[in-house]
A protein has these predicted regions:
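PLP-dependent enzyme catalytic core of the Aspartate aminotransferase-like
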Residues: 2-4, 317, 326, 330-364
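A glycine-/small-polar-enriched, mobile loop at the entrance of the PLP active site in fold-type I
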Residues: 3-54
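Active-site phosphate-binding strand-loop segment of PLP-dependent enzymes
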Residues: 10, 109, 120-176
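Active-site C-terminal subdomain of aminotransferase-like
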Residues: 15, 193-275, 289, 361
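Conserved N-terminal alpha-helix of the aminotransferase class I/II PLP-enzyme fold
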Residues: 33-79, 86, 100, 108
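PLP-dependent aminotransferase-like
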Residues: 77-142
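Conserved active-site segment immediately N-terminal to the catalytic lysine
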Residues: 169, 183-194, 203
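Conserved PLP-binding catalytic core of the aspartate aminotransferase-like
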Residues: 284-315
C-alpha cells in the first residue's frame, strides 16, 4: 500500500527517512541485539541516544548554556499545571488568549493562583493575534504566557509581546523547529513532540536555569517539579525512551537539511502555495487575518457545510488524510508540518482546484 499525504494536526507526519531508519534498527539497534523499545534507559547505549538528542537540539536552536533541556511526559497539557506550580512566586500569571490551548492553560493556572487574561481574540473566533505591543501587564505577574502558534485556528505570533520585563512562557507545540527561534527571549518554552518532531508521548521543555527552583508551590508533586527532572537529566524515572529516540533522529534529519533557516524557507514555500490558491479561489477561503497566518496550520472553508463534508470525503478517497477541521470550528484544516513534502501541498492544491471546477460546473 502506498503512503497517503497525512495532514493531521497531531500526531502528524514524520520524515520517511526517519521512519525507514527506525524500521531498519527495530530488531537490532547498532549491534546491541535488541530494539530501543527494549533497552534499559540506564544503559550506555541509551545514554548516548538521549545525550545526542539534547546536543543536536541545542545545536539546532543555539540554546544558551544557561538553559536546561528536559524530555518529559504528560504532553503539553501537563505543562498547563507545571508552569504555575513551578513559576508562581506572587501567585499571578498573565495570559494572552488566542485559542483553546491558551484558554485551557489560563483556566488551569486559576487552580493555583490568579490568572489574568490581558488580551484575547475570542471576539472574532480567534481568527487573529491581538496587538501585543502595549499590554496591561500586571505589576506582580510572575510571567506572561502565550501559545505562539494556534493549531486549531491557524494563527501565529509574528512579533513577541512586550512583557515589560516579565518572564515569557510559550507553548510552541505546533511550530517547534519550523523556523529559527531566539531562545534567550523566553524564560520557558515547551512543545509536545507529536506535531513536528516525533511521536506522541514526549514533551520538550527548555527552561532558564534560574527558573528551576526549590521553592515551588508546596503541594507540587515530585514528578511535576522541573528541578526533579533537571537534576536527573530527564532520567528521574523511565522516560518515553523510544519517543526520544525518534525525536533525536528528526533533529539529525533537520541538521542534514541545513538547519532551521533552510527548514523555514521550505515551510514558507509550502504555505505560500496553499495560501495563494485560497486567495484566488472562488470556492475556498482561508479563515485567518492575513498578517497572522500560520506556516504550519491552514484552516479553510467553502461556506457550505455540506460541501465541506463532501470535500473531506472526496479528498480522503484521493489519498489526502485528516483534512477535516477541528470539531470545535468545522471546515477543513491542512497541517503542513516540517515533514510534509512540497509535493504533498502541490498535489492537495491540484485536487482542490479540480474539486472547485467540478462542483462549480455542477452548480451551473
Amino acid at each position: 500500500m502506498s503512503r497517503v499525504y497525512n495532514f493531521s494536526a497531531g500526531p502528524a507526519v514524520l520524515p520517511e527517512e526517519v521512519l525507514k531508519e527506525a524500521a531498519d534498527e527495530m530488531m537490532d539497534y547498532k549491534g546491541t541485539g535488541m530494539s530501543v523499545m527494549e533497552m534499559s534507559h540506564r544503559s550506555k547505549a541509551y545514554e548516548t541516544i538521549i545525550n545526542e538528542a539534547e546536543a543536536d537540539l541545542r545545536d539546532l536552536l543555539s540554546i544558551p548554556d544557561n538553559y536546561k533541556v528536559l524530555f518529559l511526559q504528560g504532553g503539553a497539557s501537563q505543562q498547563f499545571a507545571m508552569v504555575p506550580m513551578n513559576l508562581f512566586q506572587n501567585g499571578v500569571g498573565d495570559y494572552i488568549i488566542t485559542g483553546q490551548w491558551a484558554k485551557k492553560a489560563y483556566q488551569e493556572a486559576k487552580l493555583y493562583g490568579t490568572a489574568n487574561a490581558v488580551a484575547s481574540s475570542a471576539d472574532k473566533t480567534f481568527s487573529y493575534i491581538p496587538d501585543v505591543s502595549d499590554l496591561p501587564i500586571s505589576e506582580d505577574a510572575d510571567y506572561v504566557y502565550i501559545c505562539e502558534n494556534n493549531t486549531i485556528y491557524g494563527t501565529k505570533y509574528k512579533t513577541l509581546p512586550d512583557t515589560k520585563g516579565k518572564i515569557l512562557v510559550a507553548d510552541l507545540s505546533s511550530c517547534f523547529l519550523s523556523e529559527p527561534v531566539d531562545v534567550s527571549k523566553y524564560g520557558l518554552i515547551f512543545a509536545g513532540a507529536q506535531k513536528n518532531v516525533g511521536p506522541a508521548g514526549v514533551v520538550i521543555v527548555i527552561i532558564r536555569e534560574d527558573l528551576i527552583r526549590e521553592d515551588v508551590l508546596k503541594e507540587t508533586p515530585t514528578m511535576l517539579r522541573y528541578k526533579t527532572h533537571a537534576d536527573a537529566k530527564s532520567l528521574y524515572n523511565t522516560p518515553p525512551a523510544y519517543g526520544i529516540y525518534i525525536c533525536g533522529k528528526v533533529f539529525k534529519w533537520l541538521k542534514n537539511l541545513g538547519g532551521l533557516e533552510a527548514m523555514k524557507k521550505i515551510n514558507e514555500k509550502k504555505a505560500a502555495i496553499l495560501y495563494d490558491f485560497l486567495d484566488q479561489s472562488k470556492m475556498f477561503r482561508g479563515t485567518v487575518v492575513e498578517k497572522d497566518r500560520s506556516l504550519m496550520n491552514v484552516p479553510f472553508v467553502t461556506g457550505d457545510e455540506e460541501l465541506d463534508a463532501l470535500f473531506v470525503k472526496e479528498s480522503k478517497a484521493a489519498g489526502f488524510e485528516n483534512l477535516k477541521g477541528h470539531r470545535s470550528v468545522g471546515g477543513m484544516r491542512a497541517s503542513i508540518y516540517n515533514a510534509m513534502p512540497l509535493e504533498g501541498v502541490e498535489k492537495l492544491v491540484s485536487f482542490m482546484r479540480d474539486f472547485e471546477e467540478k462542483h462549480t460546473a455542477q452548480a451551473d
